[in-house]
């Protein structure tokens, strides 16, 4: 466990970076289901990282130190503000426990409540819940939870856990004054009036890595979702006719070309006599594509769902290949991919 005794802001920032790594990296002690998900930190509006000592004999008392940061409008993290934590509890508990805490502030109002007042009492108007664990972005608990504050705790000692209801985060004004060399309030630090100090760069590297992980995980999830949707869409496509027509008018025009061109289209011998020509009728027949079709052989007519195709020749069967024209291109297409207008 880390030292809960208050120290200077540089040491607190270094301690915070170490705690975050311990809470978020997979190790022999921390499996994938025992870490803070990247999206929880990446979407947080504020973050408090502390070490706390708790002692109990009839009445329990807790105290400790750490830092708090806020998310700025541009998505970056603010400079750190030094904080302490204090609280009392009832019940018969005997022992001493040192814990590391990560407190996630999910809403702007939680950050503002601390920044404007200098103190923040957990519980009451700000609901507190144990934060979700694991790497699964698709099970995004934080997006569904109404809790203003998530808490994460790691401890060694006689207590099984720690309750923060009624605990108070306290602004350490003197520590901030010494580090920033001026009298400054937490509000000015957390809302961007102070540039990020170089002494806390290690902490910012850890924090920025969560945004990168979240974006990468999001891209993977979107790719999997798109693949599933594409698979579903493909499963709904009707089968193409098993046999192709013997030649379309577009390919007839090419038959007067070189021998290589004729050989290329030998896979389309001449149209059979039962194919009905419709191009000379007074009212041209139009069909609307129900599905998208991407041709796989020369002479196929590509189209997207919703396109209106003028039919040049057709058969009496919808389970056949018809010939049509679309945007100046002529080719054949599966008739069961379209509907008559």
Curated annotation (Swiss-Prot):
GO biological process, one term: regulation of ruffle assembly
Stored SUPFAM superfamilies: SH3-domain
Biased composition (Polar residues): 246-264
The UniProt record lists the keyword Hydrolase: no
Pfam family, one: SH3_9
Family, as annotated: Belongs to the SH3YL1 family.
Protein name per Swiss-Prot or TrEMBL: SH3 domain-containing YSC84-like protein 1
Lineage of the organism: Eukaryota, Metazoa, Chordata, Craniata, Vertebrata
Underlying gene: SH3YL1
